[in-house]
Design a protein with these regions (language model features):
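Cytosolic-side membrane-entry/anchor segment at the start of a transmembrane helix
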Residues: 1-39
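Membrane-targeting and insertion segments and their boundary/processing signals
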Residues: 6-13, 43-58
């Protein structure tokens, strides 16, 4: 009986490791976004190039999409974690398959992740700031 409980705990630890990596990737992407956008804004300000403000929106959109993908993966693995918690000890098979086909609900969709509060507030604020600075510099 103890061995079976250990198997379940190990499986949950494996899933938790993936969830932690997804959260860490999301955090790193946000850092890269701020760094890259700050660099482009500094360059745009020093050269008085209004077009660089719009160019800064391109990496924002790319990183927003990537970050949403990581959030989606994190949510799918959280669903897998809950599923494994509910499994009986004898049914543990160490499956790491967390697909939308199995766990697909509204919360586990790319668009829902893209427009989630954390993603939308962060990336929209950055994009809006870039465009607002462009209009402030142009006038």
């Amino acid at each position: 009986m103890v061995l079976l409980e250990e198997k379940k705990i190990k499986h949950l630890e494996m899933i938790q490791g993936v969830i932690n990596r997804m959260a860490s990737n999301s955090f790193i992407l946000k850092g890269w976004t701020v760094t890259l956008v700050a660099g482009l804004l500094a360059l745009a300000g020093s050269k008085s190039e209004a077009s660089l403000f719009r160019i800064a929106c391109v990496p924002i959109m790319i990183f927003w999409g990537l970050d949403s993908y990581y959030l989606l993966q994190e949510r799918l693995y959280r669903s897998l974690y809950v599923k494994v918690c509910r499994l009986s000890d004898k049914d543990i098979d160490f499956s790491m398959s967390a697909t939308k086909a199995e766990f697909g609900n509204q919360k586990n969709s790319f668009l829902f992740c893209f427009f989630s509060a954390t993603e939308f507030c962060f990336y929209f604020f950055l994009a809006f700031s870039c465009l607002a600075l462009e209009f402030a510099i142009v006038k």
